A protein has these predicted regions:
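Short, flexible/disordered intra-domain loops and linkers
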Residues: 2-17, 91-96, 201-207
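Short loop/turn segments at strand-loop or loop-helix junctions that form parts
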Residues: 1-5, 47-48, 71-82, 154-157, ...
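The conserved acidic donor/metal-binding loop of glycosyltransferases
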Residues: 123-126
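Short, acidic, metal-binding catalytic loop of nucleotide-sugar glycosyltransferases
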Residues: 9-39
Length: 260
């Protein structure tokens, strides 16, 4: 989780958010096993200092699943040496942020060597059961229609409704999608996009910008980034965040549904 100074909507531990996120992703993959078997899906968890009991719960959730999966450790010592100590606001970068920046960097390095599509997910996004299927089918449809690769965010962020702005509306599988110019660090894209803009992506992990995701937003000026209406996944951050709870979603029901 990125630096979070305000209380989240539900009073639970970080691990509880992570476990419910993982559970929702597994359920979403199970919702169309034939599709995700054909796509040779692999789920990788990059862990940093989770308690043994939490790791055991990860393993229990992933046991005997039809898709490949792996839990690896964050190599923070390797990545943190590339991070500047002072951020854009002139403040010292926190240890928590160093961990997050290192995790994103390691995720991007793994993504470079994927076969095709890659989905980077922060550990506080709980998914609807049809989320990943919709993302795959919508990517195929829209990418083919436009003749280019895309970037897709699963959340319908509240900030999108704070002001009037022009957007492109596209038809996915069962959802409408619209163009956006900002996101957080959870998105699906292709290996081609990752490699094309790798240096810009990684710059997010070497210097703490303001906003943090500014290099991503710069990429969206060159590549189409879209998000669904309504959301396919909800970012369970504090209730007042413009990047938090998506509108028109029963987020309490979604939270309870993914209780272990």
């Amino acid at each position: 989780m990125l630096t979070q100074s305000k209380k989240r909507i539900f009073k639970h531990s970080k691990a509880e958010y992570t476990l419910r996120t993982l559970n929702s992703i597994i359920d979403s993959l199970n919702n169309n096993k034939d599709l995700f078997k054909k796509l040779k899906t692999k789920l990788i968890i990059i862990d940093h200092n989770s308690e043994a009991k939490v790791i055991n719960k990860f393993r229990k959730l992933l046991k005997n699943k039809f898709f490949k999966n792996e839990i690896i450790n964050l190599d923070i010592e390797f990545y943190k040496k590339n991070i500047k100590n002072i951020n854009k606001q002139g403040k010292k970068v926190t240890n928590n942020q160093i961990s997050n920046m290192s995790n994103i960097n390691q995720s991007l390095n793994i993504s470079k060597n994927c076969d095709d599509l890659v989905y980077l997910v922060e550990d506080d996004y709980i998914h609807k059961i049809d989320a990943i299927e919709e993302m795959i089918f919508a990517y195929e449809r829209i990418s083919t229609q436009l003749g280019k690769e895309l970037i897709m965010c699963p959340a319908d962020y509240p900030y999108l409704y704070n002001k009037l702005q022009n957007t492109k509306v596209l038809l996915g599988n069962k959802y409408h999608w619209r163009s956006i110019d900002e996101s957080l660090c959870t998105f699906l894209t292709s290996k081609k996009i990752i490699n094309k803009h790798f240096k810009k992506f990684v710059s997010t992990c070497e210097f703490e910008h303001y906003p943090f995701e500014k290099p991503f937003h710069d990429i969206y000026k060159k590549e189409l980034c879209i998000s669904p209406m309504p959301a396919l996944a909800v970012h369970y951050t504090n209730i007042n965040s413009v990047y938090g709870l998506s509108p028109l979603i029963n987020y309490k029901k979604l939270w309870q549904k993914n209780k272990l």
